Curated annotation (Swiss-Prot):
Protein name: Uncharacterized lipoprotein YvzJ
Membrane-spanning ranges: none
Lipidation sites (N-palmitoyl cysteine): 17
Signal peptide: 1-16
Residue numbers with lipid attached (S-diacylglycerol cysteine): 17
Taxonomic lineage: Bacteria, Bacillati, Bacillota, Bacilli, Bacillales
Source organism of this protein record: Bacillus subtilis (strain 168)
Length: 69
């Protein structure tokens, strides 16, 4: 029983620590390189690449600048 409770507690803590970006998508650049894709994936930053423009959620902007530039 203790193992189950510990597992549930750890799962809850880990899921609560993950970022949940919900802001409006804003343009951040023109190019999407392999480095940028990998950095966004590692930092769990969602992105859209449409018509030659790169977009990320507005509330992920600071994280993207600090970690991927």
């Amino acid at each position: 029983m203790k193992k189950i409770m510990l597992f549930l507690a750890m799962t809850s803590i880990l899921s609560a620590c993950q970022p949940n970006y919900t802001g409006k998508y804003i343009e951040i650049g023109d190019t999407l390189t392999d480095y940028t894709k990998e950095c966004f994936k590692e930092n769990e930053i969602p992105y859209k690449y449409e018509k030659g423009k790169l977009y990320i959620p507005e509330d992920a902007f600071d994280t993207a600048i600090y970690t991927c530039s």
